[in-house]
């Protein structure tokens, strides 16, 4: 059932830049909206994707894996976007997480966008394959993953997109060779829930 699309050559993992401008004032930005996670499955799925890397990462390079953290683009007039999970390689938190200027993923602090972002579909109105697809392309995220376990948006529960030029092309495989990771689905029990989970390989 693979789509017949042309898959572009892997996008090189971007390195942090060292000539970024002076960080703007973030005191007026909303970094937390106290909105609850949409459902328990989504909460557990985010845990699988973030915690697995923290306990098993063997690459020897720093990384940041987080859930429900806002990404703020460099352009001051662009609104933040909050993926369910993000993974950024070769970076470390630039400061204490309790400070407002370090609570979110400000691209001007890290020098680059995350390598991968995930959206976990819980309803048909989240815009995961429309507005969010466009936003992540605009801020130059190399890989965008939509996990739709109930097939609410598509007959394919897992779709992976790779940035090609200014837009995304859907991948026909689940591997990220330039990052050294891949994805698979697994049916089993995690923390009391028996579900079809998305996990790293």
Where are these regions (language model features)?
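C-terminal interaction segment
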Residues: 1-38, 43, 52-55, 71-77, ...
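Short acidic/polar active-site loop segments enriched in Thr and Asp
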Residues: 142
């Amino acid at each position: 059932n693979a789509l017949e699309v042309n898959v572009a050559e892997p996008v090189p993992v971007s390195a942090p830049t060292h000539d970024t401008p002076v960080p703007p004032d973030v005191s007026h930005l909303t970094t937390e909206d106290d909105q609850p996670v949409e459902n328990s499955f989504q909460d557990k799925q985010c845990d699988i994707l973030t915690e697995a890397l923290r306990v098993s990462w063997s690459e020897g390079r720093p990384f940041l894996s987080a859930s429900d953290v806002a990404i703020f683009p460099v352009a001051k007039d662009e609104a933040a976007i909050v993926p369910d999970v993000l993974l950024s390689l070769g970076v470390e938190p630039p400061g204490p997480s309790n400070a407002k200027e370090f609570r979110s993923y400000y691209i001007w602090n890290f020098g680059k966008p995350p390598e991968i972002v995930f959206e976990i579909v819980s309803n048909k109105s989240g815009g995961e394959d429309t507005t969010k697809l466009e936003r992540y392309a605009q801020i130059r995220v190399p890989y965008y993953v939509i996990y739709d376990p109930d097939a609410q948006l598509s007959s394919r529960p897992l779709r992976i997109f790779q940035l090609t030029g200014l837009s995304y092309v859907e991948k026909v495989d689940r591997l990220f060779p330039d990052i050294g990771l891949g994805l698979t689905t697994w049916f089993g029990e995690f923390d009391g829930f028996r579900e079809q989970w998305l996990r790293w390989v």
